[in-house]
Amino acid sequence: MAKTLPFSRALLLSLSILLVARAISAGDIAIYWGQNGGEGTLASTCDTGRYAYVIVSFVTTFGNFRAPVVNLAGHCDPAAGTCTGLSDEIRSCQGKDIKVLMSIGGGAGDYSLVSEADADNFADYLWNNFLGGQSSSRPLGDAVLDGIDFDIELGTTTFYDTLARALSSRSTQAAKVYLTAAPQCPHPDSHLDAALNTGLFDNVWIQFYNNPLAQCQYSSGNTNDILSSWNTWTSSTTAGKIFLGLPAAPEAAGSGYIPPDVLTGQILPQIKTSAKYGGVMLYSKFYDTTYSTTIKDQV
């Protein structure tokens, strides 16, 4: 006859299993910041306590050996040197154990890489102006950001793998360079496939929005497409963690918005079973008035 555990020990064991299960499935929230002056400061974004990653966006012009251009919309003007005060805010965020990344690309801009030498040259610029290198004209001041985010939606599709390798090669045990990417949900992504295949990316936050014809996002109560696309991405992508990228409000994207109750009740319980699940990415801070607060405990 099998022995039974005393009630107190059985209860303790059950609680331990529950806590471990919750720890395994717990995810983070990443947010894009920088494209609307009405979204509040970088420091106030981090002060909310809702985000583990804040992605400063964007470097909108680069490649072909041109001088890169940083666009932070209504916040400040990097070209005029009025963004250097962000360094204190970046350090404040990092002091709260929040990773701050610089995003390159975006949905509007003028960028392409034309050769391996061009990619290496741009990697040097990113290293010297945002990461651990040195430059007399760092757009955001002397703070050292945690890494680079690839949000490549325009231009040529080549040499981003070279860029990823060049940036990754600068990582050390003392100072890691985090690499993240935001591919579109149609698989494989036309711009980032080669880069993602390097296996060098720590987080990949897939944009499950603005692709209404691709059958890879949520629409009108249908969760099948987004869940199928999630499974395709997680089974074929080598990355530290994979995030579900969503608009933070209906106005934040042309399509793909998921009501919070649908996300927490029908989608998150399914995708959190994946070992690669990392959490949710939201676009953007300006639109995130209530969404992250509503879903945070379930992410």
Swiss-Prot record:
Transit peptide boundaries: 1-26
Q: What is its EC number?
A: 3.2.1.14
The main enzyme category here is hydrolase
The protein's location, in the record's own words, is: Plastid, Amyloplast
pH behavior is given as:
Optimum pH is between 2.5 and 5.0. Removal of Ca(2+) from the protein by EDTA treatment narrows the pH range to 2.5-3.5.
- Catalysed reaction equations from the record: Random endo-hydrolysis of N-acetyl-beta-D-glucosaminide (1->4)-beta-linkages in chitin and chitodextrins
Which residues does the Swiss-Prot or TrEMBL record annotate as the active site? E153
**Coiled-coil positions:** none
Q: Which InterPro entries match?
A: Cts1-like, Glyco_hydro18_cat, Glyco_hydro_18_chit_AS, Glycoside_hydrolase_SF, Glycosyl_Hydrlase18_Chitinase
Q: What are the record keywords, sorted?
A: Allergen, Amyloplast, Calcium, Carbohydrate metabolism, Chitin degradation, Disulfide bond, Glycosidase, Hydrolase, Metal-binding, Plastid, Polysaccharide degradation, Transit peptide
The disulfide bridges present are: C46-C93, C76-C83, C185-C216
Q: Which parts of the sequence belong to the GH18 domain?
A: 27-299
GO CC terms of this entry: amyloplast; extracellular region
| Temperature and activity | Optimum temperature is approximately 45 degrees Celsius. Removal of Ca(2+) from the protein by EDTA treatment decreases the optimum temperature to 35 degrees Celsius.
| SUPFAM superfamilies tied to this protein | (Trans)glycosidases
Relay the activity regulation note: Activity is not affected by addition of 10 mM Ca(2+) or removal of Ca(2+).
Q: Name one GO molecular function term.
A: chitinase activity
Role summary:
Hydrolyzes chitin. Probable calcium storage protein of the seeds. Binds calcium ions with high capacity and low affinity. Involved in seed germination.
- Quaternary context: Monomer.
Assigned protein family: Belongs to the glycosyl hydrolase 18 family. Chitinase class III subfamily.
Please give the name of this protein: Acidic endochitinase Pun g 14, amyloplastic
Organism lineage: Eukaryota, Viridiplantae, Streptophyta, Embryophyta, Tracheophyta
* Gene giving rise to this polypeptide: PSC
